[in-house]
Amino acid sequence: MKEIMTDIKLRTWKMNKGRLAKLFIILLLISIMTMLFLYLKDYRVKKYMLNNNKFDVIDIDNYEVFLTGETHTMAKSDEFKKKFFYYLNKNAGVKNIIEEVGFCSGLLLNKYIQTGNEKYLNFYMEQLKGTMAYNKEKYEFYKWLYEYNLQLTEEDKIIIYGIDIEHQPLTAIMGISTLIDINKEVPQSLEEAIEYVKKNDHNAILYLKLAYDKNKEECEEYFGDNFIIFENCIKNLYPEETGSDMRDKVMMDNFSFIYSLNRDKKFFGQLGSEHIYQDYINSDYTSIDEVRFGILLNSNNSPVKNKVYSLLCVYQNINDNSPSKNSFDYSLIKNYKEDIFVDLSQENSPFYKKKYFFKDKKRAWVTCDYIQGLMILIDSNETTSL
């Protein structure tokens, strides 16, 4: 009996051992197949990225607004901005630039690129002292833009528009001064306001509003063709939008106004990356409840719905200090050694099927719901303060 029991135990042990071996082999095969599937999946994505890495593959005729999103402190941002705008200007006829500056302040930048008068650019930059925008790269970009504008015919001249809230009041006042005709008699209702504008005094903001509210007709007569610009300046000095996302709402208000003056024209703008996403998302700086400029541009009420191309700049640094690591997944691009552009919106793009790059899992959308292009910038230095 004892021998029989021992034999049974031995057979049971061998059977269990065989089952375990089979189970191990099955699990091993599943692991290998999973790894192979993931490898092939990543391979297909990476192959797509390498096959769609030229600006020429963008369907530029399909878009009216091209937005690029930067990290403000990265030096390569303005280098890319110059390169991409040059391409769009030459190939898509884009000549309107929207800047992340106040509407009134944008008048000053535009005056500079039309005239080359250094006092406008120098004043603009001086008012940025103490901010991350006070840097050599930004200054040199505007210098380049003026030189480039010189080469263009009158009908092809580049125009800058500010769309942001006014951050620098003195810059805003000097911007408004570019609307003044010094040879024109000033009506009594505007005398004090214009004097403050000429002195670049903070009081100009209050007195311009008082003059506008008191006698709109005289303002219209004095500013002439520039009156609608002046009127929008007043709206920007006293914005009605509120909330943590008021900036993006103001951006949309200003874009709608600018678009009404340039219907069916194309626009380019390089803004902070938070402003360009076309759907709600959690990121390092903004929550999922806050509306973005890109969302508003692509909304049902927008004149450019479905005509917006959002391109995100990401900065892959070899020393592992890449920006936005908490919200951006660098795994697909970690082995790149040179700057590379990727258009994400081609036919059969994997980025229409899954959300790559973004770590936010609260919304089960796909990459192209947020952006349609990616610019990978390798080892960018930080901007150089002036």
Label every PLM stretch briefly:
Residues 24-27, 31-386:
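Compositional signal for N-terminal targeting/processing segments
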Residues 9-30:
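N-terminal Sec-pathway targeting helices
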Residues 5, 15-17, 148, 369:
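Short, isolated positions within intrinsically disordered regulatory regions of eukaryotic proteins
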Residues 4, 14, 32-34:
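Residue-level detector of intrinsically disordered terminal segments
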